[in-house]
A protein has these predicted regions:
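Tandem repeat scaffolds
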Residues: 5-10, 14-456, 464, 474, ...
């Protein structure tokens, strides 16, 4: 039972003065019925409020620092700007309680029901929230530094502008969560599920997002400076105008993600999946795409000079008219890719695979194709002055009207290549002529074989028609 004197005094304006004069007294309000009372600004520090009923009470600005609040009732209560620092609120039902601007630093709210509660602008730094249900809660503008979110339910929870610095959200599910303008600096979001989440303008400086899911998430204008997204899944995510300074995206799944006007320096996309990604307007400096899968990616007219594509795959990719002077494409797979009219001066394509690659009209001055396989590639009208094709395979390639002045062709394979009106390097004119002759002979032989087969099929059809007209030939007796 509550101390009658304490309970009676609490309802008067003299309460706070009494607390000052009796600082060593611990108010005993055990089981007190405070329902509907106006406790605005009351000094309740270190008070024993076990089993007290705060239903519909107004505790705006009240100070409950280190108060005992076990088994209390809060239905319909309002505690805007109240102080709950170092309080134990574990297992309480705080559904729809108004805590806007309240302070909960170092408080414990473990396994609480916080459904629909309003913590807008509240300070929950270092608060323990493990196992609580925050479904539908409002944490817009709240401070949640160093909070552990393990086991928390966050369905339809709003974190607009919340400060989640150094928060631990590893393995948390926040599918379609609302985090616009949130600050995740130094937070741990490893394996966190943020599929379809609103992360516009969010700050992920130094954030751990390894193996996290951001698929279909809206990350427009988000900042990922020094963030770790290795093995993260961000399929069809929106990274429009996002920043990626020193971001690690190694082995991340970025298929069909949008990078419109995105940028950053020292970005690592090594071994990442960038299938069908549009990077035309992206502006990355010193980006590393080593071993990345860029099949069917769109980079038309992009400036690739600061990039490295060692071992990358460009199968079916569009790189027409790109600026890639001096870029390293060694061991890359450019099969079926288009580099039409591209600037590839002094680019390194050594050891690359380029079956049916389109390099027509491209600028290949001083480019290195040593050991490259360019079978059936299109190099028409290419300017390959001084290019190195040592040990390269150009079988079936079309070299028509190209300029190979001073190019190197040591141990190069030309079988079936077409070199009509091509300008060969000194001493290689005969080789080009023979290549063209063999190509024409092969075409003629193939054409003759096709014509012969066509005649055979026609004769079979005629015989089949004649057989159909004749009466069936019967043998034997009935």
């Amino acid at each position: 039972m509550a101390n009658p004197e304490h309970w009676k005094l609490l309802s008067t304006p003299a309460w706070n003065d009494w607390r000052i004069k009796n600082a060593n007294v611990t108010p005993d309000l055990t089981g007190a019925d405070l329902a509907g009372m106006d406790l605005t600004g009351r000094d309740l520090k270190r008070s024993d409020l076990t089993r007290a009923d705060f239903s519909r009470a107004n505790l705006a600005g009240a100070d409950l620092t280190r108060a005992t609040l076990r088994n209390t009732k809060w239905e319909g209560a309002s505690a805007a700007g109240a102080i709950f620092e170092h309080c134990d609120l574990d297992f309480l039902d705080l559904t729809k309680v108004f805590f806007a601007g309240a302070r909960f630093r170092s408080a414990s709210l473990q396994s609480c029901t916080l459904v629909g509660a309003d913590f807008a602008g509240a300070d929950l730094s270092f608060t323990r929230l493990e196992g609580s249900d925050l479904s539908g809660a409002n944490l817009a503008g709240a401070t949640l530094k160093d909070v552990n979110f393990r086991g928390i339910k966050l369905s339809n929870t709003s974190f607009d502008g919340a400060d989640l610095s150094r928060a631990v959200m590893e393995g948390m599910s926040a599918v379609r969560g609302s985090f616009p303008n949130a600050n995740f600096t130094g937070a741990n979001l490893k394996t966190c599920d943020l599929t379809g989440a609103d992360l516009r303008r969010a700050k992920f400086t130094g954030t751990i997002l390894r193996q996290a899911s951001l698929s279909a998430a809206d990350c427009e204008r988000a900042e990922f400076t020094d963030a770790d997204l290795e093995l993260a899944s961000a399929v069809e995510a929106n990274f429009t105008a996002a920043g990626f300074d020193r971001t690690r995206l190694r082995k991340a799944d970025l298929r069909r993600a949008v990078f419109l006007d995105a940028g950053g320096s020292d970005v690592s996309f090594a071994e990442a999946k960038l299938t069908e990604v549009d990077l035309r307007s992206a502006k990355f400096e010193k980006a590393n795409f080593q071993g990345a899968d860029m099949s069917k990616a769109i980079l038309r007219r992009a400036n690739l000079k600061p990039y490295s594509f060692v071992g990358a795959s460009f199968s079916g990719a569009d790189l027409a008219e790109v600026q890639a002077e001096g870029v390293n494409f060694s061991r890359a797979d450019i099969s079926l890719g288009s580099f039409r009219l591209a600037n590839l001066k002094r680019a390194d394509f050594s050891g690359c695979r380029g079956f049916d690659a389109d390099l027509s009209g491209s600028l290949l001055i001083g480019a290195n194709f040593e050991g490259a396989v360019l079978q059936d590639a299109d190099l028409r009208f290419a300017r390959a002055i001084g290019a190195n094709f040592t040990g390269a395979e150009l079988k079936g390639a079309d070299l028509a009207n190209s300029d190979f002045t001073e190019a190197v062709f040591k141990k190069t394979k030309f079988w079936g290549a077409t070199a009509r009106r091509a300008k060969p390097p000194r001493g290689k004119g005969l080789l080009f002529s023979l290549s063209t002759t063999f190509s024409k002979a092969k075409e003629k032989k193939t054409k003759a074989a096709d014509e012969k087969e066509a005649k055979r099929q026609k004769r079979i059809a005629e015989l089949e028609a004649e057989a159909a007209k004749k009466a069936p030939h019967l043998t034997g007796r009935r």
